[in-house]
């Protein structure tokens, strides 16, 4: 049984970052979180999480915790070592970090632009994977050890302060990008910190939750909300103002009193950092938002096309959906294959939406 103190101590952020455990942390992505019920400083390594989901009701301490994490990164890493993409649809919490040199883009407040930025991050992840493959490196650390300083890749931390606003604006697109990043971006050095005050299943979907084994819950309204975040109840009984339950991969749920960082401290740190240099947004602006166009001369009639032709020939009819199901490919690819079959005179005229088209036998 845990009985709260009548007079609660405020855990200062300064105290946590001054502790031996934080100062000795080797990772550039070390996060200062707070203290446990025994009074010990608690830190976490984002590279091992490798992504973090934070939830809690209004006033429970969620946004203060996000600020503590951002400040931890600013204390630990230079702009050459860690970059950040900040998405803040609420327009309130992350605006204080505008123009710091760690940013790859101005703080994004428009949900549509946020969806586009997440799509850019997916393309950047894929680019990094190609670079790693060329060097035979398994992850970003191995890569950076084997290339000159000017070719080294920084970590990128994507921070979203209110997921619900993005999900309501363009849920499918946002969910797809977040899922791809959560599944694959760790080796490429891209990590996500996502916060929401609406821990409902339409915001924290099953797919998103499955890819975020590290989760923090502040006080929530109900047992259902607690189970949505932590897969167990308990968060509804927290005291608010930084009281949280932390679930990390391979560990039991731990109760932590979150570190409190003041606005004055944030302004002092960001003012100092801005004086060291200005942000460079040119790299992020050049990342495409659409996949590169296919070289039609060389790529059109590939193995997949000829397999689809054989499938249509054996079935006697073919549709875009049947090609999708048979070969487990997306709609756009299947539609392109159907267009090529039509160009080659292999399919009859359309019979209506969703209906298969007759396959015309090939002449030998």
Regions found by a protein language model. Name each.
Residues 1-30, 35-37, 41-43, 48-49, ...:
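P-loop NTPase motor-domain active sites and their immediate coupling elements
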Residues 72-76, 344:
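Active-site catalytic microenvironments for nucleophilic, acid-base chemistry
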Residues 57-59, 196:
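The conserved Walker
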Residues 62:
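Conserved lysine of the Walker
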Residues 52-53:
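Short hydrophobic/aromatic beta-strand immediately N-terminal to the Walker A/P-loop
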Residues 104-122:
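Conserved nucleotide-sensing/catalytic segment adjacent to the nucleotide-binding pocket
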Residues 65, 69:
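Hydrophobic positions on the alpha1 helix immediately C-terminal to the Walker A/P-loop
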């Amino acid at each position: 049984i845990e009985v709260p103190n009548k007079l609660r101590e405020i855990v200062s952020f300064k105290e946590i970052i001054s502790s031996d455990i934080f100062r000795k942390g080797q990772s550039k992505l070390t996060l200062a979180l707070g203290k446990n019920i025994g009074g010990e400083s608690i830190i976490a390594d984002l590279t091992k999480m490798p992504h973090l989901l934070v939830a809690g009701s209004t006033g429970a301490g969620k946004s203060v915790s996000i600020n503590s994490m951002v400040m931890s990164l600013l204390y630990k890493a230079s702009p050459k070592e860690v970059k950040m993409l900040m998405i803040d649809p609420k327009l309130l919490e992350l605006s204080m970090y505008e123009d710091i040199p760690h940013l790859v883009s101005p703080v994004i407040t428009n949900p549509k632009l946020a969806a586009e930025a997440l799509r850019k991050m997916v393309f950047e992840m894929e680019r990094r994977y190609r670079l790693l493959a060329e060097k035979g490196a398994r992850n970003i650390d191995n890569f950076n050890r084997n290339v000159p300083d000017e070719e080294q890749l920084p970590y990128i931390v994507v921070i979203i302060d209110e997921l619900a606003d993005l999900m309501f604006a363009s849920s499918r697109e946002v969910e797809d990008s977040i899922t791809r990043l959560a599944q694959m971006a760790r080796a490429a050095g891209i990590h996500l910190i996502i916060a929401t005050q609406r821990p409902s299943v339409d915001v924290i979907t099953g797919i998103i939750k499955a890819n975020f084994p590290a989760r923090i819950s502040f006080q929530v309204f109900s047992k259902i909300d607690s189970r949505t975040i932590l897969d167990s109840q308990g968060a509804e009984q927290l005291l608010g103002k930084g009281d949280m339950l932390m679930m990390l991969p391979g560990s039991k749920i731990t109760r932590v009193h979150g570190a409190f960082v003041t606005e004055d401290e944030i302004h002092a740190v960001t003012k100092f950092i801005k004086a060291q240099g200005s942000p460079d947004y040119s790299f992020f602006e050049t990342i495409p938002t659409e996949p590169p166009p296919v070289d039609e001369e060389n790529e059109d009639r590939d193995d997949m096309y000829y397999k689809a032709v054989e499938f249509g020939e054996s079935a006697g009819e073919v549709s875009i959906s049947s090609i999708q199901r048979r070969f487990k490919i997306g709609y756009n690819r299947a539609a392109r294959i159907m267009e090529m079959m039509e160009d080659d005179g292999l399919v009859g005229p359309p019979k209506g939406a969703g209906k298969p088209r007759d396959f015309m036998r090939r002449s030998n």
